[in-house]
């Protein structure tokens, strides 16, 4: 038993050590400042730096150690502040802003100053670029996840979303919007604009599917459909409203109520269906089951 506990402890220690090493900031160039205790100031056109899979460029970078520690002693606890035309790249993600404050201790880089980001599809000939803007963006170097807060706007082809918070998983191409989220699918041809609201929106950006839950409301032309949750497939032009589903047409005064309603968004038609199970497992965030 002691051996098992010891092995588990060693494994945990190894994971922590690897995580700490992955968070170490590397800045290129010859800095100004106290080389032993810092802070060190780097300037260039631009300054280049890396941390884990993140590549950073900026007009200036300042690296500091906690008070009372040398830069060498503080490796894994230092901070780096990048200012002026900050550019961050990681795989298919590119983010921009005026300032990025990075902490080796947390592995978080916080981007501010009108931050924005784009995430290009793996197959550019068969997909749309995801664009994000917010008041602040936090990039996690331990995994390919970013968190945006404050007047968040996300666009993905003809879909656009607004919320107060967005978590975007680059590996899963999965977005979670909370804080009064609203999703809009732009009108196209005879297809009228569709607006979906609820307490939480999850979107698979490559597949163009949505899972919205918590007092959902779909508005399209004169049709308003409400329920507990909705699954929407943009490519198939169909939405399934599940749980206490009610659809009302303000023009014809018709009303349809059922446990499950299917709404064809291309022809604005609603009908009852006997069964439909939302594939919620497709929208699980990291660590969720």
Where are these regions (language model features)?
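N-terminal amphipathic/hydrophobic interface segments
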Residues: 17-289
């Amino acid at each position: 038993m002691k051996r098992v506990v010891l092995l588990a402890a060693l494994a945990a220690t190894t994971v922590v050590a690897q995580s700490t090493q992955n968070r170490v900031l590397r800045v290129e160039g010859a800095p100004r400042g106290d080389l032993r205790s810092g802070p060190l100031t780097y300037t260039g056109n631009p300054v280049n730096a890396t941390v884990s899979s993140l590549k950073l460029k900026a007009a200036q970078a300042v690296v500091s150690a906690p008070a009372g520690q040398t830069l060498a002693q503080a490796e894994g606890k230092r901070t780096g502040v990048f200012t002026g035309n900050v550019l961050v790249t990681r795989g298919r993600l590119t983010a921009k802003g005026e300032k990025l404050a990075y902490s080796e201790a947390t592995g978080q880089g916080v981007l501010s100053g009108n931050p924005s980001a784009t995430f290009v599809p793996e197959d550019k000939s068969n997909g749309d670029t995801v664009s994000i803007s917010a008041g602040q963006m936090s990039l996690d170097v331990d995994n390919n996840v970013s968190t945006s807060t404050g007047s968040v706007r996300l666009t993905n082809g003809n879909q656009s979303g607004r919320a107060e918070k967005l978590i975007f998983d680059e590996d899963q191409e999965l977005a979670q919007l909370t804080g009064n989220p609203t999703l809009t699918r732009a009108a196209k041809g005879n297809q009228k604009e569709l607006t979906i609201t609820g307490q939480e929106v999850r979107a698979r950006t490559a597949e163009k599917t949505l899972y919205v839950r918590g007092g959902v409301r779909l508005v399209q032309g004169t049709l308003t459909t409400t329920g507990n949750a909705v699954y929407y497939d943009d490519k198939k032009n169909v939405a399934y409203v599940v749980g206490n589903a009610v659809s009302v047409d303000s023009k014809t005064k018709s009303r349809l109520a059922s446990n499950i309603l299917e709404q064809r968004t291309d022809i604005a038609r609603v009908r009852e269906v006997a069964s439909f199970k939302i594939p919620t497992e497709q929208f699980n965030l990291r660590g969720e089951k």
